[in-house]
Amino acid sequence: MEEYTEGYLRALGQFRGSRYDNSFIVRIHYARIRKAGPDCQFRCRCLRDGKRSQQLQAEAWEGKCLVGTLQVELLFYGTKVNHTREVGLQMRGAGPPEGYGPWRSFSPEQVAAFARRTGDANPIHQGKRPVVPGLLLWQSLLARLGEPERLHMVFKAPVHGGEMIYIREEQVNERNEREFASV
């Protein structure tokens, strides 16, 4: 059975409105006991609600058993986030850092299709040079890794539609758990 990621996305989708316009996901943490299926009940709750940021947690429940969580930390529009200059990671330097290889890029059309499918009305995910949604990156990387039980992602700068994303894989402990870094 494949992980039913759509349930997590729909649960997070209940948090919408003008407050979320131009907000960025800065961190995602996913963990599961077992894969959530379409029969699970998905809920979302706010763990922390601040003036500049918010932490949300989507949960997958099978009966009375919590089977998975997806935590998302949002940074609301402010001076610390690069909104207006439209500089992505690859515009900061030529080529990937040493040891990184190409993973993939997302076209503006793919970004728009994801936004339509999930009901994402954030203006940064629209237009000719949209920012790739963090949840699209999460969903794609989760599939690429073979649906690991845990995945932690930190976003240091926006990635725009059409920009190549580069990753590096590392073994991080004696259990051969993998860590991926991307730029």
Where are these regions (language model features)?
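Hot-dog-fold acyl-thioester-processing enzymes
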Residues: 1-34, 79-150
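HotDog/MaoC-like acyl-thioester-processing domains
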Residues: 2-6, 23-100, 159-183
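Residues in well-ordered beta-strands of folded domains
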Residues: 73, 115, 154
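A conserved acidic, glycine/proline-rich C-terminal tail/linker
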Residues: 145-164
